[in-house]
Structure formats: structure tokens, C-alpha cells
From Swiss-Prot:
Gene (UniProt): lysS
Transferase listed as a keyword: no
Free-text comment on the cofactor: Binds 3 Mg(2+) ions per subunit.
EC number per UniProt: 6.1.1.6
GO MF annotations in UniProt: ATP binding; lysine-tRNA ligase activity; magnesium ion binding; tRNA binding
Ligand binding (Mg(2+) 2): E416
Protein name listed in UniProt: Lysine--tRNA ligase
Keyword Protein biosynthesis listed: yes
Organism: Thioalkalivibrio sulfidiphilus (strain HL-EbGR7)
Assembly and oligomerization: Homodimer.
């Protein structure tokens, strides 16, 4: 069947269903809201699947269930149907003689996709399937659009993303992915709560977008006649709270970055960001190991994570190496001496086919080499540490080597999952780094940071030694659900306008 023929068939079915809805309206029974369910299908299966048929013959278990009709098999005076609710499916057995006059005839006109309410008693069929023997049946919502059952579910990827509501109806693995996402967020929240962290909310609209190097979304506040930005990170507000005495804080919320779309990037994404006073980046690496090990056990029942044909072990201690060490390890033809000099490092990048801007210093050149030759190869759980100060404007300089900072990023499967560091609490150093960021912005770097005078004022009051970290929830869920694209773990990912 061609796309045009499918479209014509769908319009025909919609017209037929509209006629049925018109008749329901005429009878005054369209869209009732007085049916009450007392149990979910998943609860019934959990409690009664193991019971033998004799149990139901001896015990009349009466239930009231509701859900979307997903299958329908009419056999003369009796029929079977399956309804889907949030927890799963349950089978209904419907007999003409068990229903009020006319109810069975009405049922035969109903369509797959309609939402039903049913009351009756439980029994087991000859094949052992838990079933409701229905004695009261109502149509609660008439579905006008047919479900794509003829095509064995919804398989077109773009349609799945655009019409997630249909995707969720048709595909149980998709529903399970988003249940897992909820469990991941709940576990992270519980993990931090148990360790004395306070959950807070900070502004989503900010006069100065800070806390990360990224291009922001801009908007205008009409009442105040001022430009505002959707936040790219909550970092500077959370650290203001540390200054104010909330020594362990976290936030799980959205960030917005006006950048490209890819299988790993969405302009709107979810992060957990947390800060702990009197801790350093080593403490947070230890905490991250504990969090991810416990999380994989909770969600998967194992510390073995299977992703896109590869297996990652979250049980053993994670690998830790510096940016420089990783470059040398993955580029045997590059020497440490070459990485110590800007011009020689630029020559290395040129040899590797990596384009550079004239404004890049040695630290930025390192990162360009790292991102192009190392990052994608970091398959096993790995902490990369000692990021150059040039690319870490909010991180504390390392005491032994001020060229780098006390910063780490966590990688698995060749992608960054987390970023953390000992926080820069030296007011003068932070002010100087802000000034350098402003210079880069004036030179054309749209992702460079703004100068945030109020944040500096907060630092002048004194921020205790602190470490902070952000973990990308979306990428973490991708990993734990074996999802190849970030769009697979976002209920409503951003899409180009429909043609």
C-alpha cells in the first residue's frame, strides 16, 4: 500500500469513527467521567498470575479495570479483548448474556484504540491467562484516529519522536525506557538526600548566563524591559548558596544551550548539579563511583552495563588519568616535549588534521587534540583529570601545576557523562578569568562567559573550600537503556517543523 493509499484509508476510518461518535453524542453517552477503576492490570498480574484456576473458582475476586483496547476478537456471542493501562495489559472476556441488553451489540461496534471501563470477576482461561469475566462494560473515550496495529507497531523513527503519544501506546520497550528514566532520577535524588544534600531551585531565566561555556537562548522581559537568557547551567547560583551557608546543595533541572542537534545533544536537557563544602575533586570522583555503581545495581541488577554491543564494568575502580597522559597514551607518535610548547603542539594538531583558531593557547590546543583523538576511545568508565586552566574558567588551579586545574570529566562509551572540579573561590583569580572570557567573547567566541559582578561580590564574602559536579541525566539514561540517540530518552525531543 502506497503512502497515498494509506492516507486515504486512514481518512476513511476516521470518518467512520466520527459517525460513531456522533451517535454517542446523540445518546448522551459520549465522554463520561463517572467510572472508577480500583486496580491496575500490573497489580492483578503480580498478585494473581501464580494462582491456579481452582483458586478463582473458590474465590470471587471482583475488579474494576480500565484502559485502551489494544486487541479485539469477536466469536459470536462471546469475545476477548485486551486493554492497556499504565502498568500493562489485562484480558477481558465478554459474553452477550452477561451484559445488559444491547451492551454486547454496542461493544461489537467499538474500535481498537477506544478506552473502556469494565467490571467483573477474575478467572484463568484454559491456556492459563488471567482474565476478567466482564458483567459491566462502558465506552469511556471514543478514539478517532486508528492505531498503527496493521504495521505491527510504530517503526518510523521521526514519527515516533513527533507523535510520542502513539509511540508510548504501541511500544512497550519505549514505555520501559521512560520508567527507567524516572527510576534513575528518583535514585539520584535519594542518594544525595541520604548524604545530607539539600535540593534547591535556582532561576531558569538569568540576566547573565553563566556556569558553562555555551551559546544561550535569549528572551525579553517586557515588564522590566530587559534581556534575559535561559540558563545554560545553575552553577553560579548554587555556589552563591554555598556562600550563604547551604554547604551541600543540589538541583535536578533543565539547562538550555542554543547549539546543534545530534544523537548526543538536545538544546534542552536535564542535569543534576551538586556542591559540597569542605570537599575536593577527589572526593567527588569517589562519590561518583559510588553513585554510578549503586545506580547500575538498582536499575539493571548488575554493574555490567551493555550498550550498543559493548559491555562496561562499573564494579571495579574507574580508570583515572590526566588530559596529557591520555593524549600521550592514545597518540604514541606524540611526545611530552611537543605538548609542552604552543608552536610544537600546534604542529601536532596540524599533523593530525585538527583545525585551530589563532586565538587558541596551549591549553585549548590540548583539548582540541584530546577531543579529536582520545574522547571517542574512552569506552570503559574513566575519569580524565587536570584540565588546562585556559578551558576551565571556574575551576581551582592545581597547587603543583597552575597550568592545569583540579578538574575531572567522567567518560564511558566514548562520551562525557559528568564534569566536576574543586571550585575556584579566589575572588581575584576568578575576576581575572572572567576578564579573559570577556576578551574571547569580544573576539568572536559566542560561547565564552559573561562577566558576573554579583557572583564576584558573593565570593568576596568568602566561599569555603568546595567541590561541585554536574551529571547529564539524558546521556546516563541512554547508557542504562541501551538507547543509541538522546531523542530516545526524551519524551518530546526538539524536531524541525513538519513539512
Amino acid at each position: 500500500m502506497t503512502d497515498q493509499e494509506q492516507g486515504q484509508e486512514e481518512h476513511k476510518l476516521i470518518a467512520q469513527r466520527r459517525e460513531k461518535l456522533t451517535k454517542l453524542r446523540e445518546r448522551g453517552v459520549a465522554f463520561p467521567n463517572d467510572f472508577r477503576r480500583n486496580v491496575m492490570s500490573g497489580e492483578l498480574h503480580a498478585e494473581y498470575d501464580a494462582k491456579p484456576a481452582e483458586f478463582f473458582e473458590q474465590n470471587a475476586i471482583r475488579v474494576s479495570v480500565a484502559g485502551r483496547m489494544m486487541a479485539k476478537r469477536i466469536m459470536g456471542k462471546a469475545s476477548f479483548t485486551q486493554i492497556l493501562d499504565m502498568s500493562g495489559r489485562i484480558q477481558l472476556f465478554i459474553q452477550r448474556d452477561s451484559l445488559p441488553d444491547g451492551a454486547y451489540s454496542d461493544f461489537k461496534t467499538w474500535d481498537v484504540g477506544d478506552i473502556l471501563g469494565a467490571e467483573g470477576t477474575l478467572f484463568k482461561t484454559k491456556t492459563g491467562e488471567l482474565t476478567v469475566n466482564v458483567d459491566s462494560l462502558r465506552l469511556l473515550t471514543k478514539s478517532l484516529r486508528p492505531l498503527p496495529e496493521k504495521f505491527h507497531g510504530l517503526s518510523d523513527t521521526e514519527t515516533r519522536y513527533r507523535q510520542r503519544y502513539v509511540d508510548l501506546i504501541m511500544n512497550e520497550p519505549v514505555r520501559e525506557t521512560f520508567r527507567t528514566r524516572t527510576r534513575v532520577i528518583q535514585f539520584i535524588r535519594q542518594f544525595l538526600d541520604q548524604r545530607g544534600f539539600l535540593e534547591v531551585e535556582t532561576p531558569m531565566m538569568q540576566a547573565i548566563p553563566g556556569g558553562a561555556t555555551a551559546r544561550p537562548f535569549a528572551t525579553h522581559h517586557h515588564a522590566l524591559d530587559m534581556q534575559l537568557f535561559l540558563r545554560i547551567a545553575p552553577e553560579l547560583y548554587l555556589k552563591r548558596l554555598v556562600v550563604g551557608g547551604f554547604e551541600r546543595v543540589y538541583e535536578i533541572n533543565r539547562n538550555f544551550r542554543n547549539e546543534g542537534l545530534s544523537t548526543r545533544h538536545n538544546p534542552e536537557f536535564t542535569m543534576v548539579e551538586f556542591y559540597e563544602a569542605y570537599a575536593n575533586y577527589h572526593d567527588l570522583m569517589d562519590l561518583t563511583e559510588d553513585l554510578l555503581r549503586d545506580l547500575t545495581l538498582e536499575v539493571l541488577g548488575s554493574t555490567q552495563v551493555h550498550y550498543q554491543g559493548e559491555t562496561y564494568d562499573f564494579e571495579r575502580p574507574f580508570t583515572r588519568m590526566t588530559v596529557k597522559e591520555s593524549i600521550l597514551q592514545h597518540n604514541p607518535d606524540v611526545s611530552e616535549a611537543e605538548l609542552a610548547d604552543l608552536e610544537r603542539a600546534r604542529a601536532v594538531a596540524q599533523r593530525l588534521g585538527i583545525p585551530l583558531k589563532d586565538s587558541y593557547g596551549l591549553g585549548k590546543v590540548w583539548i582540541e587534540i584530546f577531543e579529536k583523538t582520545v574522547e571517542g576511545n574512552l569506552k570503559d568508565p574513566t575519569f580524565i583529570t587536570a584540565y588546562p586552566t585556559e578551558v576551565s574558567p571556574l575551576a581551582r588551579r592545581n597547587d603543583e601545576d597552575p597550568f592545569v586545574t583540579d578538574r575531572f570529566e567522567f567518560f564511558v562509551g566514548g562520551r562525557e557523562i559528568a564534569n566536576g572540579f574543586s571550585e575556584l573561590n579566589d575572588y581575584e583569580d576568578q575576576a581575572e578569568r572572567f576578564r579573559k572570557q570577556v576578551q574571547e567573547k569580544e573576539a568572536g567566541d559566542d560561547e565564552a562567559m559573561h562577566f558576573d559582578a554579583d557572583y564576584l561580590r558573593a565570593l568576596e564574602h568568602g566561599m569555603p573550600p568546595t567541590a561541585g559536579e554536574g551529571i547529564g541525566i539524558d546521556r546516563l539514561v541512554m547508557l542504562l537503556t541501551d538507547s543509541p540517540s538522546i531523542r530516545d530518552v526524551l519524551l518530546f525531543p526538539h524536531m524541525r517543523p513538519e513539512s
